[in-house]
């Protein structure tokens, strides 16, 4: 009897490449620098925790790239509160 094999495939949206490995795991590769378009193209089946983590990382990257005075003030205040509770951590 022939056993069905899981063959690798790649689906490209132009902004996100989704690659399925032989073991069934999917990997995402983001290839666009516009957060709105990235979020529009994210698969609906993605785990909410993974999506939240990716969103937080993306926002941090955008902040480091071009901080505004308000976001910089917020960032400094959060770090100061964290320092006063726990001490500095890198």
Swiss-Prot record:
Q: Which residues form a coiled coil?
A: none
Q: Which domain of life is it from?
A: Viruses
Q: Name one Pfam family in it.
A: PB1-F2
Q: Where is this region: Mitochondrial targeting sequence?
A: 65-87
According to the record, the segments passing through the membrane are: none
Q: Which InterPro entries match?
A: Flu_proapoptotic_PB1-F2 (IPR021045)
GO BP: symbiont-mediated perturbation of host apoptosis; symbiont-mediated suppression of host cytoplasmic pattern recognition receptor signaling pathway via inhibition of MAVS activity
Q: Name one GO cellular component term.
A: host cell nucleus
Pinpoint the site High pathogenicity: 66
Q: Which UniProt keywords apply?
A: Apoptosis, Host cytoplasm, Host membrane, Host mitochondrion, Host mitochondrion inner membrane, Host nucleus, Host-virus interaction, Inhibition of host innate immune response by virus, Inhibition of host MAVS by virus, Inhibition of host RLR pathway by virus, Membrane, Modulation of host cell apoptosis by virus, Viral immunoevasion
Compartment(s) of residence: Host mitochondrion inner membrane; Host nucleus; Host cytoplasm, Host cytosol
| Task of the protein | Plays an important role in promoting lung pathology in both primary viral infection and secondary bacterial infection. Promotes alteration of mitochondrial morphology, dissipation of mitochondrial membrane potential, and cell death. Alternatively, inhibits the production of interferon in the infected cell at the level of host mitochondrial antiviral signaling MAVS. Its level of expression differs greatly depending on which cell type is infected, in a manner that is independent of the levels of expression of other viral proteins. Monocytic cells are more affected than epithelial cells.
Instruction: Give the family, as the similarity comment puts it.
Output: Belongs to the influenza viruses PB1-F2 family.
Q: What else is known?
A: Is not encoded in all strains, and seems to be dispensable for replication.
**Complex formation:** Oligomer. Interacts with human SLC25A6/ANT3 and VDAC1. Interacts with host MAVS.
Under the heading HAMAP family, the entry gives: INFV_PB1F2
The protein's name: Protein PB1-F2
Specify the species: Influenza A virus (strain A/Turkey/Ontario/7732/1966 H5N9)
- Gene name of the encoded protein: PB1
């Amino acid at each position: 009897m022939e056993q069905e094999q899981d063959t690798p495939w790649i689906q490209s949206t132009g902004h996100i490449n989704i690659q399925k490995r032989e073991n069934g795991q999917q990997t995402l590769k983001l290839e666009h620098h516009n957060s709105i378009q990235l979020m529009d193209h994210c698969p609906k089946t993605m785990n909410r925790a993974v999506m939240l983590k990716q969103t937080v990382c993306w926002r941090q990257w955008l902040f480091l790239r071009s901080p505004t005075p308000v976001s910089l003030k917020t960032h400094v205040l959060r770090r100061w509160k964290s320092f006063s509770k726990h001490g500095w951590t890198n």
